[in-house]
Amino acid sequence: MSVQVAAPGSTGLGPERLNPEELVRQTRQVVQGLEALRAEHHSLAGHLAEALAGPGPVAGVELLEEKQQVVNHSLEAIELGLGEAQVLLALSAHVSVLEAEKQRLRAQARRLAQENTWLREELEETQRRLRASEEAVAQLEEEKSHLQFLGQLRQYDPPEESQRPESPPRRDSLASLFPSEEEEKKGPEAAGAAAAQQGGYEIPARLRTLHNLVIQYAGQGRYEVAVPLCRQALEDLERSSGHCHPDVATMLNILALVYRDQNKYKEATELLHDALQIREQTLGPEHPAVAATLNNLAVLYGKRGRYREAEPLCQRALEIREKVLGADHPDVAKQLNNLALLCQNQGKFQDVERHYARALSIYEALGGPQDPNVAKTKNNLASAYLKQNKYQQAEELYKEILSQEALPAPLGAPQGGTAGDTQQQVLRRSSSFSKLRESIRRGSEKLVSRLRGEGMAGAAGMKRAMSLNMLNVDGPRAARTQLSQLSTRHLSEAPRTLSISTQDLSPR
């Protein structure tokens, strides 16, 4: 039978819940009591057995036998209790071992979780350093390609350039960031030769090559390559020659060109101010390169609508070119055209007419009335007449432009083509002639629209007919007839004002 041991102090209302240590302690006490009780029962059983086995008749044999049975039954119960107690003790020991193993495993799990956290942090740090290393490698690869390119450019330098004495200041052929269409047709060699003939600052061959490469990247819209390339070359020049050097001013002009193509006029203006200061210090305040930088600054101010600030810069550039090149030089005429456009945007039409008239006289004296620059200037002057509602003068100029059956190449333009090419075919292949035709078409449409009394609203409807009848280069007689028929149909009242000119100070 099983023996239930009550805890000391128990009230008997129910078993008290014991902790494992207390239960084991009490179980050991019960085992000790059962072992003592078993020894007593063994002694009683021995005495009863001796009494029953004694010689002779024994009184109360039945009572002794009954006692012996009770003692034997008690011994069995004691043995069962001892067995159960031993099982409980063994089970308690096993549970203790399991609990210790459980605690050990829990500690190991906590340690592994902490190690996992450390490993995650280490992995994140390693990944961050890997990304930083990859970015550094990419940047170094880009710098390496730039340095390799700059190293290749050095083969264009003269072999003894560092040993040569400094030549007198000469004209910067890359100074003009916004050249006219004829200047855009010239290659770096032609520009360098022209600068050498004028005794101007001569650009090193590698800078001319770098300029062409930057122009190519900018034309493809790859400004992320063009800008670092310019900045790397600028840093190299500043390290080798110092900041106040004509080559540094040239690189500032090239970088300003890239910013201008990105419509970052403020940054380009700051660079040109720096280039102007360098050129004034190194080349003198009346050098052609200074005039070119002043003109470029005036163009940038004009693109930002700051015409009042642009006009004195353009005026100073004109004065320098008149003093250095002479009053009848083509560059003076180009500067007069820029100054006239600035005055036109400010409504100074008297100055506009005066500047255009002087530019016309220069072009006609140098290239004759057939010079395309004459047609361009007349077209600009006609546009100014239209803004002042001087339709008669504008009509006469358009008639003069359209009366030219064929126009020769501009002054200074290279003569290309085969011997069988006519001058008109050469001009048709040039973008200059196409832009001139488009400008004349727009101006003549405005004039015809005003003469017909249709205003700007009717200009779109007759655009196709006018472009076919008036601006076909092979049929100028039809245009002259059309204008003559409309010359007598002026409005009695002044029409509304046209929109401002869409022409820039010089074409891009």
From Swiss-Prot:
Expressed in postmeiotic male germ cells (at protein level). Expressed in the testes (at protein level). Expressed in spleen, intestine, brain and ovary. The lineage of its organism: Eukaryota, Metazoa, Chordata, Craniata, Vertebrata. PROSITE patterns: TPR, TPR_REGION. The keyword Mitochondrion applies. Gene3D superfamilies: Tetratricopeptide repeat domain (1.25.40.10). Residues 1-20, 154-197, 409-441, 486-508 are annotated as: Disordered. SMART domains: TPR (SM00028). TPR repeats lie at residues 207-240, 249-282, 291-324, 333-366, 375-408. One of its GO terms (molecular function) is microtubule binding. Transmembrane segments: none annotated. Its main location: cytoplasm. It comes from the Eukaryota. Residues 420-434, 498-508 have a biased composition (Polar residues). This is Kinesin light chain 3. The keyword Repeat applies. It comes from Mus musculus (Mouse). Residues 88-150 form a coiled coil. Pfam families: TPR_12. Keywords: Coiled coil, Cytoplasm, Cytoskeleton, Differentiation, Microtubule, Mitochondrion, Motor protein, Phosphoprotein, Repeat, Spermatogenesis, TPR repeat.
